[in-house]
């Protein structure tokens, strides 16, 4: 039987590119679309991250520059290829920014997903892996957070787009029994591929902690702003469940394997995390150890929408998908530093 073909949206981004690599290694055929709003491209046919994925795997990546909110562009990809499954990463993803420009977040993250789902249904594609987020839980009512934790009490428009999309997916599965949807609620992805050839390279100022720490360590930025030092945590800074990007990518492959191999349909949600929380300052210290560099930081006010502490109970993913995180904080920092030190300006300095 021919291996399934998976359409990956947002495939040139940080999580998308690492997942494409693991999917190719697992034998899937991959078609990528991305509008390149948060991915480096030199103007070549293939974005740099995907060019390096091809180099690492020795396998071909089909790429189309497509905006998922554009119905015609999306439909043309389905017409050109026989798609079996979709893994949907394409989204705007900065919590703070979403509070400033909510309409753009609702349009991109929700309208884009609806356009994609309509194109899938029109082409009889009903297997869908959704890139969700721990933000659907809002301020945790209990820790660790299980999938039974209430969703919807979100603290940012970004979180709401993920929550509302999950609700749409649940309604879709109820209305049409052909749909099989796995929603992966990830905690905080960090790290890079062990080769140091691909990693996190945000356009402009990083919104996430780890690339910011790495850019300070490599000399690209003078210091890290630590948002909030008065949280009720062991050192006053926010505590998160950081997960290695390769563990996360492997979780997506496990989700695709599940959809490929079972006849079961409906909506399934799984947490992907390590179950361990680290504070911002814990991460700074671990990164200093891994890199041998000093990371200067300043303590500033909290950002709107940030919660104090959040970490996962990921035992359901272990039970149902056969997945668990294998890589710890030291490996996360070592792999990030290898990527950043080999690529001080990200993908722009080949």
From Swiss-Prot:
Active-site annotation: 158
Binding site for NAD(+): 13-15, 34-38, 67-68, 89, 93, 162, 186
Keywords assigned: Carbohydrate metabolism, Galactose metabolism, Isomerase, NAD
Gene Ontology terms: cellular component: cytosol
Cofactor(s) demanded: NAD(+)
Binding-site list for substrate: 133-135, 186-188, 207-209, 225-227, 240, 303-306
Pfam families given in the database record: GDP_Man_Dehyd (PF16363)
Domain of life of the source: Eukaryota
InterPro entries per the UniProt record, alphabetical: NAD(P)-bd_dom, NAD(P)-bd_dom_sf, UDP_G4E
Coiled coil: none
Record note on disruption phenotype: Required from embryogenesis through pupation, even in the absence of galactose. Loss of Gale during pupation leads to defects in fecundity, both in male and female. Gale activity toward UDP-Gal is both necessary and sufficient for male fecundity, but Gale activities toward both UDP-Gal and UDP-GalNAc are required for female fecundity. Eggs may require a more substantial pool of specific UDP-sugar substrates than sperm. Individual loss of one activity or the other later in development results in differential sensitivity to galactose.
PANTHER family linked to this entry: UDP-GLUCOSE 4-EPIMERASE
Subunit architecture: Homodimer.
Family (UniProt): Belongs to the NAD(P)-dependent epimerase/dehydratase family.
Protein's recorded name: UDP-glucose 4-epimerase
Species whose genome carries this gene: Drosophila melanogaster (Fruit fly)
Organism taxonomic ancestry: Eukaryota, Metazoa, Ecdysozoa, Arthropoda, Hexapoda
């Amino acid at each position: 039987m021919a291996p399934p073909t998976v359409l990956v949206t947002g495939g040139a981004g940080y999580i998308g590119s690492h997942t494409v690599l693991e999917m190719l290694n697992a034998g899937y055929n991959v078609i990528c679309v991305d509008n390149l709003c948060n991915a480096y491209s030199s103007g070549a046919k293939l974005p740099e991250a995907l060019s390096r994925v091809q180099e690492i795997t020795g396998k071909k990546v089909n790429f189309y520059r497509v905006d998922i909110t554009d119905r015609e562009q999306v439909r043309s990809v389905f017409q050109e290829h026989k798609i079996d499954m979709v893994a949907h990463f394409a989204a705007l993803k900065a919590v703070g920014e979403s509070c400033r420009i909510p309409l753009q977040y609702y349009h991109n993250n929700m309208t884009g997903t609806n356009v994609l789902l309509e194109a899938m249904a029109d082409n009889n594609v009903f297997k869908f892996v959704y890139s969700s987020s721990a933000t659907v839980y809002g301020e945790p009512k209990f820790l660790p957070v299980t999938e039974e934790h209430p969703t919807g009490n979100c603290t940012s428009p970004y979180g709401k787009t993920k929550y509302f999309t999950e609700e749409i997916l649940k309604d879709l599965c109820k209305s049409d029994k052909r749909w099989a949807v796995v929603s992966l609620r990830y905690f905080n992805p960090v790290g890079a591929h062990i080769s140091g050839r691909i990693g996190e390279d945000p356009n402009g100022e990083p919104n996430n902690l780890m690339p910011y720490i790495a850019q300070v360590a490599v000399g690209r930025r003078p210091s890290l702003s630590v948002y909030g030092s008065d949280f009720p945590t062991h050192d006053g800074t926010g505590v998160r469940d950081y997960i290695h990007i390769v563990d996360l990518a492997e979780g997506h492959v496990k989700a695709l394997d599940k959809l490929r191999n079972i006849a079961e349909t409906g909506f399934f949600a799984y947490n992907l995390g390590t179950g361990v929380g680290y504070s911002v300052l814990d991460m700074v210290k671990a990164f200093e150890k891994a890199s041998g560099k000093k990371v200067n930081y300043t303590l500033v006010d909290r950002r709107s929408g940030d919660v104090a502490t959040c970490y996962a109970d990921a035992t359901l993913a272990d039970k149902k998908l056969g997945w668990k995180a294998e890589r710890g904080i030291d490996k996360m920092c070592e792999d990030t530093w290898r990527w950043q030190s080999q690529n001080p300006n990200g993908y722009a300095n080949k």
